[in-house]
Amino acid sequence: MYKITVGISCYKQKRWLHRCLRSLVNQTIGKDKFEIILINDDPEERLEDVCNIFSDHLNIRLINNEKNLGLPSSLNKILQNSLGQYFVRIDSDDYVSRHFLYMLSTFLDMNSGPRIMNSEMNCQAVACDYFKVDNTGQLMSRHSAEKEFVACGIMFTYESLCDVGFYDEDYKMREGHEMIRRFKEKYKVYNLPLPLYKYRIHESNRTKDSEQVQSYDKKLKGDK
């Protein structure tokens, strides 16, 4: 068992994956406290070479999908194989502060669980502020996750995710928005006003497909 499972799904983003994993090497929480489950969702690409570089420094499990399943199905596969008390998703083209895992897990240690079940501070998930960075890693702008939601970088208690039912695989985009909406119907999500996550903006971001985004935004509104 681990305190944290870090879930990373990679599809045609190998060029960014080294930076993502490197940001997890020197976390201020011991490496024995967290595992990384990396899903390769591109059958035509191999990630073993990347994993081998970090295998002495990180507890990585690589799962190769036999066919492209899409992000929500891959995230659910990670959750089904998780051994962590907490779960956090990091996108393969993003990276995090060295204090990211410690700060978010410590907050949940102090503010979730049956011992404070009647407290207004009882949270089953915590997000943090983030920086947008360009494809070279240069800072562009700071954002509040509370005001400008992103689906990655949120740490959940595993039990609460089991309760709400993981990701809806019908949502090939906006899967995080759909899941967090269901999650907030039952549980609190707190936002730490600390920019611990780096959200990379580049030419192949999934959200660049505005027609797809708008289509699933309409689906979200229709499914209310």
What are these regions (language model features)?
Residues 99-139:
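Conserved donor NDP-sugar-binding/catalytic core segment of glycosyltransferases
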Residues 129, 190-196:
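Catalytic beta-strand/loop signature of glycosyltransferases that borders the donor
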